[in-house]
Amino acid sequence: MNKFSFTKMHGLGNSYIYVNMFEETIPESLLSSLAVKVSNVNTGIGADGMILICPSEVAPVKMRIFNSDGSEGKNCGNGLRCVAKYAYEHGMVKDRSFFIETLSGLVKAEVTVENGAVTNVTIDMGKPRLKRSEIPMIGLDAERVVAEPFEVDGKQYEITAVSMGNPHVIFYVDDITTAPVTTLGPIVEKDERFPEGVNVEFVEVVNDHELHFRVWERGSGVTQACGTGACAAVVASVLNGKTARNKETVVHLAGGDLIITWTDEGNVRMTGPAETICTGVYYY
Ligand SMILES: N[C@H](CCC[C@H](N)C(=O)O)C(=O)O
């Protein structure tokens, strides 16, 4: 019987099964199917996916993230905060500020420590990718996708698309409590205009530094929070003149709040909690 030790952690209720690949060995060919199995709340552990904390040649640690459908994502904001917490608390890094490698490049983490435990984490997520080709999205000629008409099943919408290393499309709504998350979300996730699929976000603007946010995630469906999605929502809101550049913006997600700033230098900074739920051994 094969097995590996895991730590279940969450960022605002967006939980993953974390595996320390400095200590565990799992065949590459099994990673996708294992992500599906461990995510199952009935026959597995229960989570939005699986995250591997791996050795890296360019940073103290590398994060790989697998959604609950087994697809591998290229970035994960809530995951990065939990990886930073894990790395610091397990002595994998000595400084409170350090780099983490992702499939979409290097990001910088800064942990807040109280009595030896990481209570909050800031991630410099780097620059958003705004070109249509970088999302990626196919369709009109305009280089960026900002307030673009978008038809779905004969209904007209307006979208803005942003990549944080992974693809996001933002719909603005008047009332977040009635956003079509579970009806429009799964349709747009697989829309052919997004060749790699897309994370689908719904945003209600409160004022120039406050948003309400819900998400249908590519590969995981409805989650309590999406860190990269919240970053994309802030960038989209600045591009649409709805929130202020270089100003801390509170994003209210179902699982709690993130503080996000798109700085004048161009980077997106995200601050929020990261929590450990439990540890255990998974048999497969
Ligand atoms: N579903 C995403 C990966 C997880 C992102 C999200 N959980 C976050 O916190 O950023 C994707 O396939 O791009």
From Swiss-Prot:
EC number(s) from the headed UniProt entry: 5.1.1.7
Residue positions of the active site: C76, C226
Acetylation among keywords: no
The keyword Cytoplasm belongs to this UniProt entry's keyword annotation: yes
Gene Ontology terms for molecular function: diaminopimelate epimerase activity
GO biological process entries: lysine biosynthetic process via diaminopimelate
Any one of the GO CC terms: cytosol
Alphabetized Gene3D superfamilies for the sequence: Diaminopimelate Epimerase, Chain A, domain 1
InterPro entries: DAP_epimerase_AS, DAP_epimerase_DapF
Record Pfam families: DAP_epimerase
Catalytic activity: (2S,6S)-2,6-diaminopimelate = meso-2,6-diaminopimelate
Record-annotated site: Could be important to modulate the pK values of the two catalytic cysteine residues: H168, E217
Function, as annotated: Catalyzes the stereoinversion of LL-2,6-diaminopimelate (L,L-DAP) to meso-diaminopimelate (meso-DAP), a precursor of L-lysine and an essential component of the bacterial peptidoglycan.
NCBIfam families with a match to the protein in the record: DapF
Family of this protein: Belongs to the diaminopimelate epimerase family.
Oligomeric form and interacting partners: Homodimer.
Protein name: Diaminopimelate epimerase
